[in-house]
Amino acid sequence: MAQVAGKKLTVAPEAAKPPGIPGSSSAVKEIPEILVDPRTRRRYLRGRFLGKGGFAKCYEITDLESREVFAGKIVPKTMLLKPHQKDKMTMEIAIQRSLDHRHVVGFHGFFEDNDFVYVVLELCRRRSLLELHKRRKAVTEPEARYYLKQTISGCQYLHSNRVIHRDLKLGNLFLNDEMEVKIGDFGLATKVEYDGERKKTLCGTPNYIAPEVLGKKGHSFEVDIWSIGCIMYTLLVGKPPFETSCLKETYMRIKKNEYSIPKHINPVAAALIQKMLRSDPTSRPTIDDLLNDEFFTSGYIPSRLPTTCLTVPPRFSIAPSTIDQSLRKPLTAINKGQDSPLVEKQVAPAKEEEMQQPEFTEPADCYLSEMLQQLTCLNAVKPSERALIRQEEAEDPASIPIFWISKWVDYSDKYGLGYQLCDNSVGVLFNDSTRLIMYNDGDSLQYIERNNTESYLNVRSYPTTLTKKITLLKYFRNYMSEHLLKAGANTTPREGDELARLPFLRTWFRTRSAIILHLSNGTVQINFFQDHTKIILCPLMAAVSYIDEKREFRTYKLSLIQEFGCCKELASRLRYARTMVEKLQSSKSAVAHVKASA
């Protein structure tokens, strides 16, 4: 019987009944709404669905006594019938419960009933670096340093405790509300029992698999260094080093060490990647060597990052800040194209190469072509006409948008369109195609000129040429506070907020039945007037969020809707969306208010 530190994992005998026989628990049991730990008598309320992976489903769970919120990983015992499955689960729990580090997902206990095993973990609300990567592709060098430093710190702790993670990848590097990295998912992890032990077997396929694992030569801590090399490459280049469309070809490239680093990558960064991706595991740096590399010692590492970095690049003003904030002049960013990290005129970052233009640039149509293609493919399969529709299987909460428009007011006959984002920041797209945004602190401002050049100011210090626009912005903000929203107190500024950049409203138009809004991060939102339903489309995540008449907010992957189908209501809105995206794309000037009627 599998055992975790004196506590057995039991699988009820009836779970082994063959399928199709009445009473067989091979039919998936309903997960209870209240989860009870029989040992401590703690009770948890099962809340929002967070996602699924492997055998497990993950939910937000709330301790009914302390009101603390956790992530509950729930595994049906029907999936733990074979000894190796049970042993794997036992090992995962045993390893994770032995760990306690700032950059490792916190373990808060586990328990079971007849049907499920429940693991109580730290909740990471900002998902993982995988979603960030899908939205951002390549990140700026200071951001890469920030995420890598924390990942290495967590991995140092694992290695010092003789744990090899064996599946370090973007999807297993989770982010909390403070944008701190937490290493999670110890399903493939193992413990080194004695010095020099080489592990021979590995159940499962790691994402960034090292050549010595493929060669079955025995492996150890060096596999995690290889994975960190792949992570660093992916963060800076925007795609994994050995990626091909065919797994066999990818493995061949790994074995041959066949990859190339684009010329625009800083040579210091390229050198560190090359060291970590050496075929010979003994010639790779150890985890303790990494943070002493020039890449980390010579470059700027932000102490905090704003959550806006999940979808748009940050602005780097001063590293570290030495100027009294009250004396700072408004900072104006040099416009280098929308996807380049913004350089501010006042102070340059530590290294010139940090600001080099990424190899790819954001498409001129802001991902409308991709969205059109995605919607065309989806609508072609007629998802609401399937014989069996299982819309809930298409749900993917990890793809939930970072920003959407929560309120808007149309004054375009005189001034422009005012709107509020879900984080309570407020913006106006003026009729002259300029934009002004006030952050949710009620003080910071972002001004975007017609040519997309961005400037950063505050309500206490701005050029007189902007006086009228700032007065109008405040008017819009007050109007929406009084008439359209629950007035909320200003949020307290936190460290890292000075690096925030918000997506802005790129273009919009109204039809008889809806308003269509296109944000600069690629998101398209359609609000339907009659029933107040909304859809929010993200081409980078290839996902749609649907807010129905009951104001329930659910996010689906478009590819999974193709596979599992969807209700007629969502299908008709997705057909309408395709027509609207086509209209957005064909408008000659997709940077302001498009006149339309449909």
Curated annotation (Swiss-Prot):
The modification Phosphoserine is found at S25, S26, S260, S326, S340. Activated by phosphorylation of Thr-201. It comes from the Eukaryota. Residues 532-534 are annotated as: Important for interaction with phosphorylated proteins. It holds the Pfam family Pkinase. Coiled coil: none annotated. Residues 44-296 form the Protein kinase domain. InterPro entries: Kinase-like_dom_sf, PLK1_cat, POLO_box_1, POLO_box_2, POLO_box_dom, POLO_box_dom_sf, Prot_kinase_dom, Protein_kinase_ATP_BS. The active site is at D167 (proton acceptor). One of its GO terms (cellular component) is spindle pole. Induction: By growth-stimulating agents. It is found in: Nucleus; Cytoplasm, Cytoskeleton, Microtubule organizing center, Centrosome; Cytoplasm, Cytoskeleton, Spindle; Midbody. Changing T201A: Abolishes activity. Residues 185-212 are annotated as: Activation loop. This is Serine/threonine-protein kinase PLK1. It comes from Xenopus laevis (African clawed frog).
